[in-house]
Amino acid sequence: MTAIDPHIMKQINCFIQTLAPLHPQAAYRIAVVEAYNTQKHVFKGMFLVQAPYYLVLSAKDHPFAAVNAGYVMEQLVLYLVSKGFATCYLGDAKSKPDLDQYQPMIVVAFGKAAATAVKKPASRKKLTELVNQPPVAQQNARKIIEAARIAPSAFNLQPWRFMPQDGKIHIFMT
């Protein structure tokens, strides 16, 4: 496991300070944990990977805490990937609670990528399979639905269906 240059780690920490939450009133914090210091956090869960660093997002109880956590962490993951780092969300990972009523919500492992990822085309459903009344006439609606169509989903199931109607897009889960 290769350590990240301290200058680059400082850039990552600076970027964390600039993250734009979806719900600013939903208090959260992100800790960067080095692998040798994981005893402090004691990660447990079904899908753990070994990495030189982990990001632990903890949040206070709030109705939008989970949405906010996902929104903020995805910004950070996209930043790390754009800088050549490999990332992995640790599904069902658990960490010790922080002080001050912050509960761990998301853990992401990251580090220098061992090799450049070779992207193969993702198998995605056709637009006509996701929209109940094709064709989508409104150009803005088409762009929004296309973005959702190519977005990742768990096991690439794409469980969403769309119904554009009266300038709105109704979204249903299958």
Regions found by a protein language model. Give the residues of each.
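Acidic, surface-exposed loops and disordered segments
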Residues: 1-174
